[in-house]
Amino acid sequence: MRLFSLLPLLALLVVQAAGQSEVTSDDPATDAGSTTNSTTDTKPRIPSQDEILGQMPSINPIRTGNPQMDAFYMMFPALGSLLKWGSLFPAYSILGAIPDNLQPTAAASKVVLVLADDATAKTRVARQNPPPNPLGQLMNWPALPQDFQLPSMDLGPQVGSFLAQLPAMPTVPGLLGAAAPVPAPAPAPAAAPPPAPAPAADPPAAPVPDAPQPAILGQAALQNAFTFFNPANFDASSLLGQSVPTFAPPNLDFVAQMQRQFFPGMTPAQPAAAGTDAQASDISEVRVRPEDPYSQEAQMKIKSALEMEQERQQQAQVKDQEQVPLLWFRMPTTQNQDATEEKTLEDLRVEAKLRAFERQVIAELRMLQKIELMAKQMRSSAAAQNGDSPYRISYPLSRTPIHKITRADIEQALRDDYVRRLVNKEAQRRARNSGINTQKANALKRQAKSQDQTLSKEDIVQIMAYAYRMANEQMESEKGKQDKVYAAYRTEQNPMMMQQRQWSEEQAKIQQNQQQIQQNPMMMQQRQWSEEQAKIQQNQQQIQQNPMMMQQRQWSEEQAKIQQNQQQIQQNPMMMQQRQWSEEQAKIQQNQQQIQQNPMMVQQRQWSEEQAKIQQNQQQIQQNPMMMQQRQWSEEQAKIQHDQQMAQQMAQQGLMMTEQRQRQWSEDQAKIQQAQQMAQQTPMMMPQMQQRQWTEDPQMVQQMQQRQWAEDQTRMQMAQQNPMMQQQRQMAENPQMMQQRQWSEEQTKIEQAQQMAQQNQMMMQQMQQRQWSEDQAQIQQQQRQMMQQTPMMMKERQWAEENPQSVQQQGPMMMQQQMPSMMQREVEDEDNKAEDDLVGEAGPQMPENEGTARHKVDALGVGGNKRKKSKSKSAPPTVINYYYAAPQRPVVQSYGTSYGGGGYGSNAYGVPRPVNSYQSQGYRAAVGNDEVDEMLRQHQTMARTINPKQPGEVGGSESQKSNSNPPTTLTPAPQEQPQEHRVHKSPSSAPSETEIENAPSSDPQVGSIFTYGEGLLHPFMGLLPVERPDDPWNQKPYDPHHPLYTGGGSYDAYLRDGRHRRDTHIMGQGTQHGILTPGMLERLLRIKMDFQRRFPHLYKGMLNHHTNLTRVEVQPPVLGKISKPKTKTKPKNEDEPVFELGAAERSLFEDETNDSLEKDPEPEPDEEDDRDVEEPSESSEPRGFSSKKSRDENDIDYFNFDDDDVDD
């Protein structure tokens, strides 16, 4: 039973988590639904670890900033982590009630809420208190497991279905009704904690209850509501198991609110079990709240027959608004029967971890209970003394059986200041006593294992995911086909599905055009062209309504235009050009003959033709901004032409100008057009075909064209007067053809030009033309390549079809995007390779440092997941945390030569910096100036491993993969790809790059064969790296099996001559090579800035000394009050400045502004002041300069010595 109770929770959790990850839906409620029933995901998806990890808060030691909370987290690491990540796991479920949606049971209970008139039913407390609803709980729990699918997630729609399905569940109602009492005993067998009913239901039955549950709850609740309350039902253990599920039903708003509070993100999905109920069934929220207190009491009374403990649990549960017990993930024992056979080693390991975690949580809960009990006693004794009633504050924890404690209980307990104080005290005591051990463990005593192996984020995720999965698997087996019934229905609620549905509708539209495209991109064009025209009309209507189709529309318009010209193209690109060309020629000739006779008339006529065409296109074009430009342009051109045509004939000049402008425009246009075509059509491979065809080989085409042109030349000569018009007309006529035409026109122009005297101008034209055709050729090639990579293209095309809009935006980028996308594909493939753990792979250790931090390098492949600091796993792989000072062992003042303590700040020998501080691992010691500089010069203090993984993978997928190495394997897969393991090291740091690059790929037996530093490794030389988690050296910050660098065990570096202790002057004596690395420069500047900021005067003084302006400005502290206000106290003195003391250095030109100082009341200072300050009056010309300035800066300078005098 326990299993079952857990399962539902787990399922919920899973769903929840999945929802959070990607379940297919964004809102938890749907989540659950989708998880269970969506067609796509029949199984509840167990969120992948990456997903979960992605959502996890980082696992740093929890520093809330609230000392008491910190103490709590320190004392109860496991609990803390549960609470902290609760939001992730069962999400609401762990920490909050399982929303009804999620709770299959909840669904049932919803119904109950609807149906139930019993006081009890109504009173269901948010806590889904089993006590109030033992029945509900019992039912729910069993249901939960069944639900595990969370099919019932979507309660609203499903309630009906559940009821419909109830028949399948008849047993459950029986269970609920009749068995309910029975279950209490039953649960014990199943798993004492789970709800009794569940056992009765038995796993198979349990799944059914899911659907029936609502009915059951409804009927049973009504019939048996009280039964459930019977002590029998209440069997404590069953309650424990069940209470959680039970919680779901209560619709307490407050639960929802709590959730909102705690998991703001989740709220909507599962407002709270209670909220959810209401939401799902539209039951007006159950008015549980008011009855709550009394109902609880009544229940308590009923239960008083049960052990007190249960009573307490119930109360506690009532209090827990968050209905899922923290221990929801307890491993149900029953699971093992089904699961064990399949369990892989990894699963078993995780399960062991899960159990360990569970044990830890239980231990912590017990301790918390004790603390709470103490607090309670303290409070009651205090109250007794004060005559207060002792019980004003309820202490839920001590009464709540451990397995039922929910987050709410803990929160409530922590609200009590006594509890907080006790926790704090205890934490302090612990810190004092165990501090030493802890520190050692954390720092690095070899033997010390950190006392509590705190789980890393990944572990927790792994465990939780495992718990879900187990529950899930159970559920899957039992998951009714019911889910499928709703799958379709649910898809609709599921945002993801919504998207799909919407998308499919769009697809339907798009398909009219694109079915062919999809089936056969190549054929597509022909077929599409033929069909296109018809469709274009349809589309255009749709298109206007459907922005999504914009692009399509543009494309189809172009298609339409293209079609006329290009059906032929398709069959014979070359022919097409000729034909088209000849058509154009025909037109051109007509025009041109006229042109010759009457240029003006021709223009008009041509213009009208253009207009006609433009109008045809333009209706479409209007929708197509690109075309707009053209149209606009063509209109402008038309105007221009009227003027310019005359000019052309009168003076070639005019022609030249417009032509240039025109040419430039046409090139731009060509480019734009190209980009546009590509953007719009590349997805559909259109342009490629087309362009490829029409520039099969730009040179060839050009020759062809030239030949044609030559033929046409005769006809064309007339055109010469009007090349521009012609071009224009054609452009306007058909953007798609524009480029060809541009070419042809440019050619015509060229050829005419050759005949004409325009040669020089034409030369330019030619050059441009040639260049353009070259560009075209390049683009063509690229496109061709892209075509060859068609698989990619297809993908891309498909994508483009799916997101026409993005394609639009990306249009211009399309080319670039495609190239990178190919590259990216390769990279991805590489990455996939890389993901199989390389032996020597090193991964970035902390995202913040990604670029610069040193990386763990598992050079000898002694595996272990590089990404994890799990103590509990097999040997924790070397984790060298050079990044921030993690818990450190107290600094040892050793003045001997500490091995490598000279980090930046430490004196060269002295205290080794706290152990993890940045670089003081004995790993690099830079002793002389040169070395220091060198170290600075390689700016990364540790080697950088250039790691091809995408950053996203850091915590997640990698870790998943690697953590599956069963401990038994001696070494993870040999390092197959040494080349990816490129480590750039600073020389002092370690095996030279060459060593690493060429390190023989590892021998599976020995790990990678590497140059071991003999001195370092000697004792281990003979040992193969057999991983044993408990090997003491695995507890070291570095693993003898992974020497960080070879050699280096000696001190002679410190003794060698010529290598002096680093001199710490800011500017070292002679940096031998006079190098100033950016790093040094930055440091110097920073020092300078700081100094300047903190000691402005001193800085100024030093600066002046440096520059030989000796100006001393001292601003002594003013002891009295500064009496500036009395400025005029000694008016007379000013007149005769006293020249004695300051005179020599005093600037003679001081301004009166300084007088304020002189007038200080205390006579002595004044005297001096006067001396100093009064001189200014003497000569007032230059005084403004330095003295005034400096004076203004620092108000009170008793001596303001200025350059002026000094230099005198």
UniProtKB/Swiss-Prot annotation:
Stretches forming sequence repeats: 493-518, 519-544, 545-570, 571-596, 597-622, 623-652, 653-680, 681-696, 697-720, 721-733, 734-758, 759-788
Task performed by this protein: Required for proper assembly of the eggshell.
Which terms under GO biological process does the entry name?
A: chorion-containing eggshell formation; egg chorion assembly; response to starvation
Q: Where is the composition biased (Low complexity)?
A: 268-280
> What residue spans carry the Acidic residues bias annotation?
828-839, 1163-1178, 1194-1208
MF-aspect GO terms: cis-regulatory region sequence-specific DNA binding; DNA-binding transcription factor activity, RNA polymerase II-specific; structural constituent of egg chorion
Organism, by scientific name, is Drosophila melanogaster (Fruit fly)
N-terminal signal peptide? 1-19
Q: Which GO terms describe its cellular component?
A: egg chorion; extracellular region; nucleus
Q: Which residues does the annotated region (12 X 26 AA approximate tandem repeats, Glu, Met-rich) include? A: 493-788
Ranges annotated as biased composition (Polar residues) = 32-41, 957-977
Q: Which Pfam families match?
A: Dec-1, DEC-1_C, DEC-1_N
Q: What is this protein called?
A: Defective chorion protein, FC125 isoform
Q: Which domain of life is it from?
A: Eukaryota
Q: Which UniProt keywords apply?
A: Repeat, Secreted, Signal
Transcription regulation keyword on record? no
Give the residue ranges for region: Disordered: 23-60, 184-212, 268-294, 828-875, 944-1010, 1114-1208
Q: Where is this gene product found? A: Secreted
